[in-house]
Regions:
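Active-site bordering "gate/hinge" segments
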Residues: 1-135, 139-142, 151-154, 180, ...
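Dual-mode signal for accessory low-complexity, basic/Gly-rich regions
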Residues: 43, 108-281
Length: 281
């Protein structure tokens, strides 16, 4: 890729992306379920094998068979790592320049304020070699650099391109076009340890729809996944809604897993949130 602008900037970068994906439909009686998995990397020798991707897809599909709804309740919720990155996406949207200068963000005027628990650190690593979101400059030619966005749970900075920065009377953060290798630091627990810590709860493996109010932070999304009782997976779940407010969801994060998903530009482990509403039967 080559970028050149009339203001005198000329830069280039070379990138590659390799991938293997698999989608499977499974059936049991009249019930049918679908799931998928994929591997992605900059270099082909860093990909999982086609066999491993296929086996994981099959196992994920089979565990969904026999899914049912659960009664409406309020329980701890684990967002599986590939799904947990969506929470960070909602956060980034709320601190992005466009939402801020339009005053259409539930995190308006939160700079320097506590947004997450004090163990949470969220940062950019744009110069990480081999990572999926690495870039030495943004889409306006502004140099990127590692920086903390959240430290000790406190919001340290916004996500700005040059136009939104001018509107806010601030400096660009080198984020025209988005964030680069956004990372939430992992804790010590893996997904299995999180599951074992829960007496009754819900592991979200798929989200459906986009019921997000960016102004108020109200959150409501269709979901499917696995029900947890006494620290073990009990049965698959479908046709439920996970609801809350994003401010509360961020503050009520209990743990961030060490099962980091590195297949995209957001690098995130599973996230355990206390006390979300599951709307079911």
């Amino acid at each position: 890729e080559v970028y050149g602008f009339s203001h005198g900037f000329l830069g280039h970068s070379r990138k590659s992306r390799q991938g293997i994906s698999c989608s499977v439909i499974g059936g049991e009686g009249d019930s049918m379920q679908r799931d998928y998995w994929y591997s992605a990397a900059r270099r082909v020798n860093n990909l999982d094998s086609a066999r491993d991707v296929g086996e994981k897809t099959a196992n994920r599909t089979l565990r969904r068979l026999g899914a049912r709804r659960v009664p409406t309740c309020q329980v701890p919720v684990i967002y599986e790592a590939p799904i947990a990155s969506s929470l960070l996406s909602h956060f980034i949207s709320a601190i992005s320049g466009g939402a801020l200068y339009r005053k259409a963000s539930f995190l308006l005027d939160h700079l320097g304020k506590q947004v997450f628990p004090d163990f949470v650190r969220i940062h950019e690593q744009p110069l990480l070699i081999g990572a999926m979101g690495s870039a030495s400059f943004d889409s306006e030619g502004v140099a990127t650099a590692p920086r903390d966005i959240v430290k000790d749970g406190v919001l340290q900075g916004y996500v700005l391109g040059s136009y939104s920065a001018r509107r806010l009377k601030m400096e660009t953060t080198g984020n025209a076009g988005g964030v680069h290798n956004l990372t939430i630091d992992p804790g010590e627990q893996g997904l299995e340890e999180m599951i074992k810590s829960i007496e009754k709860g819900f592991l979200v493996t798929e989200l459906i729809g986009f019921g997000i109010n960016g102004v108020t932070g109200d959150y409501s999304r269709g979901a499917s996944g696995l029900w947890i009782e006494k620290g073990e997976i009990c049965h698959p779940v479908e046709e439920v809604t996970v609801a809350g407010n994003l401010k509360d969801i961020f503050r009520n994060i209990v743990a961030v897993g060490n099962d980091i998903d590195v297949r995209r530009s957001t690098r995130c482990g599973s996230i355990l949130v206390d006390g979300l509403t599951i709307a079911g039967e």
